């Protein structure tokens, strides 16, 4: 050690340097920082494995991928954390270590004898010595140099601790040797990369090198070196113990230090943590030599324990961060407006390009087609017709009575500026008693004027409805939710002006009584408006706009009642979606139930107004059931006091799907009287049953005459004339019957003919059952109805033509076909063919062809047909039908008697068979008893 005074004078103050370094050592090694006693520890010998330098250098550079176990810290603190882990490997190293006490930890844990033994063992292993780059003058500062270069490598692995310490020491030695002959400067930068290159050049890889005892430091030299740091002149050059931030891939860090001109090793400022590295370099040799194996094993266990704790904490932090990210992303996803989900395309009907057949038809449609008798060839020839009739068949069979009300009567458009009348179901309807089967509307949706000769002048109070009454139209689909979400339509001034002729007390707008036909239109209009007040189910597109957030479309009334509901619904998360859906469905069902109850109360209230009070059984006597209609039984009775025959139709209101339609029928019939329409007498409500008293036609229906008698052309003309007269009246009121057939044409004993909305079904046979198997009786339907096209009042003219064929041949065309095949034949065949057309006169043929034109535009109207030659010249008087009515009635009575006798005979035969069976059983029992008695006697 040189005693150059200049060098000593330039060294920094020892106390100030040790205070800064000891504080860092306390944080890293658990010291208490209460003094510098560690500086006075005795020195011990040290060795340097030069062979390990090169391997350690390579391993240190290859360990660049190591990452910090603590994600909360930056990458630049990795080296400090790793050193902290290493320091825990030896509990003895928890003493204060200053920059001058190089091997104080070693001296405190091992005696000089153990160090000497270790040195001897190392010398025995590697006797070759290479001192080409090491001089005895520098031997006292080798360990300081090791500390100096330790900061150049900030990433290392625990398995390379011993090699790293030696490598750093050698790098610093070479570095010091390089700057030895330089001029003294205030600060010089030392790059450990260059030093690493120099040491590799100086030390061959193939030569194992280990230091001689000359490399060891004595306690005296260490104390001298420690004392050399006490000069306060170089306080401004006090080295920073904090490691600089490493660059990418752990590049060595340049450390600025001050070196004297002659002995640069004196000014080597040892950073913290190198003492532990130098110690572990020797402890790794001890593992190889087998000394202190128990202590090392405990150290290994403790080290692995600490590292596992670090890893677990790192995994927990990563898991928590990932869970936080996932939760935040889930919240973001919950608040994001999604696209439609769970969409299903159940059926896709296509056409095979080769065969031309439909592919992908629903199973129900396939069954209908196969059971209907429509062959594959027919399906291929008229594919679109098949599709239309299948849809129509399903609509007719699945529709309810309330929807039928919209299909029965005509539609009139409101004023253009009315937002409440945006769809046809929101329009007014004129109604008259239809039949028990379906009937369709033919009203206007465009408001185009028609000829005025079919209109009643009293209907001009509503110009828009009068002008566009007879434009052919189909019932439009149900209005969207926007219609139901609007304000109550019945209170709008536009609808008030349209309904200003209603005499009812239920109308919410001011009304002007009128005894003419406008009463019917206003009555039906009010019922239609009440229909619109029903809450509609939510439309799916409004849901998908905020999915998966549950929200519903509210009407203004609902929003006013619960203004906080939308805000609560928009905060929902996908996890609460099923609960929200269930609650929403429950609310909708509850609202529907309340609406049904409300409408039921309104229905009974309205019935009580239009019906008479009292018990009908006290006013009518001798009730005899003569038929069973679709909506109730039909009875005949005599009015007490006058002895007039009446027909009573009894209906259970709870079982009626079309209660509103029944009310409108009663109201229309009350205000309408026509000689060719069955007149309404009175109505009663008794114990939940509606009793409708009507004019009784004792001759029965035209069906009895057709099935039992043969009509002449004159008699057929009489029936056509009376029927057309009634249709003209209905059409003038904006009503179409849509179910004209022989069952709904009633006759009196004098031959008078009247239209009715129900048919007598006293004749129970196969033919009559076929007529009533399907609501709407497709055999009399017009092609435009079957093909789902727009239609108007001329559908009744087509039905009249089919009824003419029925009167000629005894049955309508296609009666023996299934209803679906009959619809197919009507749609594809057009005008049906007669069996014997040559037997008809030219006037009847012309009249029939005019009635059965496929195109509605070419078909005649009721007024035009009334002026036809066949009606004016060939048709006979009504009295000509009286003999046919009497004959048909006699035959019908005879059939009923025969049927009763057959039933009695069948009952007698069954009784005789049962008696014979009983006698046979008794005989067998007696025989068995006799046999048993004889056996007993023998015994």
Curated annotation (Swiss-Prot):
In this UniProt entry, the residues modified to Phosphoserine are 87, 165, 169, 418, 502, 547, 562, 585, 924
Instruction: Return the GO cellular component terms, semicolon-separated.
Output: cytoplasm; incipient cellular bud site; mating projection tip; nucleus; plasma membrane
Effect the entry attributes to changing residue 348 to D: Reduces interaction with CDC42
Q: State where composition is biased (Basic and acidic residues).
A: 584-597
* Record's comment on post-translational modification: Autophosphorylated and phosphorylated by the CLN2-CDC28 complex in a cell cycle dependent manner. Autophosphorylated on serine residues.
Q: Which InterPro entries does the record match to this protein?
A: CRIB_dom (IPR000095), CRIB_dom_sf (IPR036936), Kinase-like_dom_sf (IPR011009), PAK3-like (IPR051931), PAK_BD (IPR033923), Prot_kinase_dom (IPR000719), Protein_kinase_ATP_BS (IPR017441), Ser/Thr_kinase_AS (IPR008271)
Entry comment, domain topic:
The CRIB domain is required for the association with CDC42.
Where is the PTM Phosphothreonine found along the chain? 167, 203, 573, 773, 927
Q: Which gene encodes it?
A: STE20
Query: CDD domains, alphabetically?
Result: CRIB_PAK_like, STKc_PAK
**What Gene3D superfamilies is this protein classified in?**
CRIB domain, Phosphorylase Kinase, domain 1, Transferase(Phosphotransferase) domain 1
Q: What is this protein called?
A: Serine/threonine-protein kinase STE20
| Comp. bias (Basic residues) | 232-243
Its function? MAP4K component of the MAPK pathway required for the mating pheromone response, haploid invasive growth and diploid pseudohyphal development. Links the pheromone response G-protein beta gamma subunits to downstream signaling components. Needed for mating in haploid cells, induction of a mating-specific gene FUS1, induction of mating-specific morphologies, and pheromone-induced proliferation arrest. Required for the regulation of the actin polarization and bud emergence during cell cycle in G1. Involved in the high osmolarity glycerol (HOG) response.
Which sites are catalytic? 739
Domain CRIB: from-to ranges: 337-350
- Any signal peptide, and if so, which residues? none
| Bias kind Low complexity: ranges | 251-283, 320-330, 542-552
A molecular function GO annotation: protein kinase activity
Q: Which GO terms describe its biological process?
A: bipolar cellular bud site selection; budding cell apical bud growth; cellular bud site selection; cellular response to hydrogen peroxide; cellular response to starvation; intracellular signal transduction; invasive growth in response to glucose limitation; MAPK cascade
């Amino acid at each position: 050690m040189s005693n150059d005074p200049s060098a000593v004078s330039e060294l920094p103050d020892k106390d100030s340097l040790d205070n800064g370094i000891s504080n860092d050592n306390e944080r890293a090694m658990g010291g208490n920082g209460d003094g510098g006693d560690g500086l006075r520890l005795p020195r011990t010998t040290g060795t340097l494995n030069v062979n390990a330098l090169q391997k350690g250098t390579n391993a240190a550079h290859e360990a660049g991928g190591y990452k910090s176990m603590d994600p909360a810290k930056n990458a630049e603190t990795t080296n400090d954390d790793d050193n902290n882990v290493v320091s825990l490997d030896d509990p003895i190293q928890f003493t204060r270590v200053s920059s001058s006490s190089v091997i104080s930890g070693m001296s405190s844990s091992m005696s000089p004898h153990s160090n000497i033994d270790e040195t001897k063992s190392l010398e025995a292993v590697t006797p070759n010595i290479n001192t080409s780059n090491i001089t005895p003058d520098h031997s006292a500062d080798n360990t300081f140099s090791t500390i100096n270069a330790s900061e150049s490598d900030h990433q290392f692995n625990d398995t390379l601790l011993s090699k790293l310490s030696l490598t750093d020491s050698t790098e610093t030695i070479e570095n010091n040797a390089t700057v030895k002959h330089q001029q003294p400067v205030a600060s010089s930068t030392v790059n450990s990369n260059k030093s690493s290159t120099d040491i590799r050049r100086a030390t061959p890889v193939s030569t194992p090198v280990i230091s001689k005892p000359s490399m060891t430091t004595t306690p005296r030299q260490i104390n001298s070196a420690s004392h050399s740091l006490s000069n306060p002149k170089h306080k401004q050059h006090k080295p920073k113990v904090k490691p600089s931030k490493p660059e990418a891939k752990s590049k060595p860090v340049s450390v600025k230090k001050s070196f004297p001109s002659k002995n640069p090793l004196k000014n080597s400022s040892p950073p913290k943590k190198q003492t532990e590295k130098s110690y572990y370099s020797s402890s790794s040799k001890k593992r190889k030599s087998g000394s202190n194996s128990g202590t090392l094993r405990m150290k290994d266990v403790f080290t692995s324990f600490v590292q596992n704790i670090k890893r677990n904490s790192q995994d927990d932090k990563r898991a928590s961060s990932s869970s936080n990210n996932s939760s935040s992303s889930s919240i973001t996803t919950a608040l994001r407006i999604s696209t439609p989900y769970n969409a299903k395309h159940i059926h896709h009907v296509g056409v095979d390009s080769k065969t031309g057949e439909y592919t992908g038809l629903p199973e129900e449609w396939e069954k209908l087609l196969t059971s209907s008798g429509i062959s594959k060839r027919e399906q291929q020839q008229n594919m679109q017709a098949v599709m239309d009739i299948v849809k129509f068949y399903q609509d007719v069979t699945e529709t309810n009575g309330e929807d039928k009300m919209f299909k029965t009567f005509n539609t009139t458009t409101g004023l253009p500026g009315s937002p409440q009348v945006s769809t046809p179901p929101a329009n007014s309807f004129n109604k008259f008693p239809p039949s028990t089967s379906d009937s369709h509307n033919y009203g206007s949706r465009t408001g185009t004027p028609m000829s005025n000769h079919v209109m009643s002048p009293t209907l001009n109070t509503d110009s828009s409805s009068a002008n566009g009454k007879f434009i052919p139209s189909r019932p439009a689909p149900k209005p969207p939710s926007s219609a139901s979400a609007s304000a109550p339509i019945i209170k709008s001034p536009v609808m008030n002006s349209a309904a200003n002729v209603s005499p009812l007390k239920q109308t919410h707008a001011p009304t002007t009584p009128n005894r003419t036909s406008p009463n019917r239109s206003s009555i039906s209009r009010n019922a239609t408006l009440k229909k619109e007040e029903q809450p509609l189910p939510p439309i799916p597109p409004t849901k998908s706009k905020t999915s998966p957030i549950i929200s519903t479309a509210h009407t203004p009334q609902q929003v006013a009642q619960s203004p906080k509901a939308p805000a609560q619904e928009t905060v929902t998360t996908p996890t609460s979606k099923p609960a929200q859906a269930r609650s929403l469905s429950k609310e909708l069902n509850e609202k529907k139930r309340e609406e049904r109850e409300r409408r039921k109360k309104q229905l009974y209230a309205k019935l009580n107004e239009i019906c008479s009070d009292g018990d009908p059984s006290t006013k009518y006597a001798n009730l005899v059931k003569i038929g069973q209609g679709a909506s109730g039984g039909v009875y005949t009775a005599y009015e007490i006091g006058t002895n007039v025959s009446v027909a009573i139709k009894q209906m259970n209101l709870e079982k009626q799907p079309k209660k509103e339609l029944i009310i409108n029928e009663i109201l229309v019939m009350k205000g309408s009287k026509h000689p060719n329409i069955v007149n309404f007498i009175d109505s009663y409500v008794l114990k939940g049953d509606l009793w409708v008293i009507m004019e009784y036609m004792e001759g029965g229906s035209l069906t009895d005459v057709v099935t039992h008698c043969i009509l002449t052309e004159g008699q057929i003309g009489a029936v056509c004339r009376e029927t057309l007269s009634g249709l003209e009246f209905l059409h003038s009121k904006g009503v179409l019957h849509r179910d004209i057939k022989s069952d709904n044409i009633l006759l009196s004993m004098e031959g008078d003919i009247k239209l009715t909305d129900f048919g007598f079904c006293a004749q129970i046979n196969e033919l009559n059952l076929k007529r009533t198997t399907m609501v709407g009786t497709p055999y009399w339907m017009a092609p435009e109805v079957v093909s789902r096209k727009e239609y108007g009042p001329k559908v009744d003219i087509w039905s009249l033509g089919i009824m003419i064929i029925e009167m000629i041949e005894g049955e309508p065309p296609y009666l023996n076909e299934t209803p679906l095949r009959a619809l197919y034949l009507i749609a594809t065949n057009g005008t049906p063919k007669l069996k014997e057309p040559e037997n008809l006169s030219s006037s009847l043929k012309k009249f029939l062809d005019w009635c059965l034109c496929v195109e509605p535009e070419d078909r005649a109207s009721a007024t035009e047909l009334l002026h036809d030659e066949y009606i004016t010249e060939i048709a006979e008087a009504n009295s000509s039908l009286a003999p046919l009515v009497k004959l048909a009635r006699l035959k019908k009575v005879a059939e009923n008697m025969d049927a009763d006798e057959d039933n009695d005979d069948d009952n007698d035969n069954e009784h005789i068979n049962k008696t014979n069976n009983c006698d046979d059983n008794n005989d067998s029992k007696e025989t068995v008893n006799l046999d048993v008695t004889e056996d007993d006697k023998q015994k």
